[in-house]
């Protein structure tokens, strides 16, 4: 059975992600970030992991629980997609700065521009520019190797997507599970089927 573990960072959107994962043919397992360990995740042996949105900052363990450990210890062999706070956790895990966004977004739709021209499987069939819903007050900044910036927002040039140059680790600041994200379902499909 194909399993997708979703680390819930206490977010109200987590079951929207789980529903889409199920529709795409993978069995979603949702577990709160403070209710499982790396050993517990290894026992589940998921095919992939999604680290959910949530309140707070990746700089505080009480906000992200096991999420940083998942990125550091499991990302070498298990594909990971971080959404919003999960994206910020990926940035933080690999040395990027976390700072306040130039503008706070709560359910606002932005134009997202893919800036990485390499053919990434996560963005297969995705237009170079698309609309996406944003809910955040923090952003990833000062990204450097091993992370690569994949997308920015058109209106404020904030980093909207990153990936690890060697491991199957991807982050998106926007919400692919939102109906306001025009190609979000396709991005999640690609994560489940192409990464």
Swiss-Prot record:
- Enzyme Commission code: 4.1.3.27
**Which Pfam families does the record associate with it?**
GATase
**Which superkingdom does the taxonomy of this entry point to?**
Archaea
Residues the entry annotates as binding L-glutamine: 54-56, 88, 137-138
Q: Name one GO molecular function term.
A: anthranilate synthase activity
InterPro entries, per database record? Anth_synth/Amidotransfase (IPR050472), Class_I_gatase-like (IPR029062), GATASE (IPR017926), TrpG/PapA_dom (IPR006221)
Task: Give every Glutamine amidotransferase type-1 domain span.
Answer: 3-195
Q: Which GO terms describe its biological process?
A: L-tryptophan biosynthetic process
Q: Which keywords does this Swiss-Prot/TrEMBL entry list?
A: Amino-acid biosynthesis, Aromatic amino acid biosynthesis, Glutamine amidotransferase, Lyase, Tryptophan biosynthesis
Reaction(s) the record says it catalyses: chorismate + L-glutamine = anthranilate + pyruvate + L-glutamate + H(+)
- Supply the SUPFAM superfamilies for this chain: Class I glutamine amidotransferase-like
Active site residues per record: 84 (nucleophile), 175 (for gatase activity), 177 (for gatase activity)
The protein's job, in short, is: Part of a heterotetrameric complex that catalyzes the two-step biosynthesis of anthranilate, an intermediate in the biosynthesis of L-tryptophan. In the first step, the glutamine-binding beta subunit (TrpG) of anthranilate synthase (AS) provides the glutamine amidotransferase activity which generates ammonia as a substrate that, along with chorismate, is used in the second step, catalyzed by the large alpha subunit of AS (TrpE) to produce anthranilate. In the absence of TrpG, TrpE can synthesize anthranilate directly from chorismate and high concentrations of ammonia.
Protein name as it appears in the record: Anthranilate synthase component 2
State the organism named in the record: Saccharolobus solfataricus (strain ATCC 35092 / DSM 1617 / JCM 11322 / P2)
């Amino acid at each position: 059975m194909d399993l997708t573990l979703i680390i819930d960072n206490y977010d109200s959107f987590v079951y929207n992600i789980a529903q889409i994962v199920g529709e795409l043919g993978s069995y979603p397992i949702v577990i709160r970030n403070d209710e499982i360990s790396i050993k517990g995740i290894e026992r589940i042996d998921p095919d992939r992991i999604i680290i959910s949105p949530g309140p707070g900052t990746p700089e505080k363990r009480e906000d992200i629980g096991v999420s940083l450990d998942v990125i550091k210890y499991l990302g070498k062999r298990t594909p990971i997609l971080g959404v919003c706070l999960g994206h910020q956790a990926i940035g933080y895990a690999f040395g990027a700065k976390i700072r306040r966004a130039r503008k706070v977004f709560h359910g606002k739709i932005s134009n997202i521009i893919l800036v990485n021209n390499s053919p990434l499987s996560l963005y297969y069939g995705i237009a170079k520019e698309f609309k996406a819903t944003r809910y955040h007050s923090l952003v990833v900044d000062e990204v450097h190797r091993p992370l690569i910036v994949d997308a920015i927002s058109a209106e404020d040039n904030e980093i909207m997507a990153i990936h690890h140059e060697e491991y199957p680790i991807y982050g998106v600041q926007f919400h692919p599970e939102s109906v306001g994200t025009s190609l979000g379902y396709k991005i999640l499909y690609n994560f489940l089927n192409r990464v």
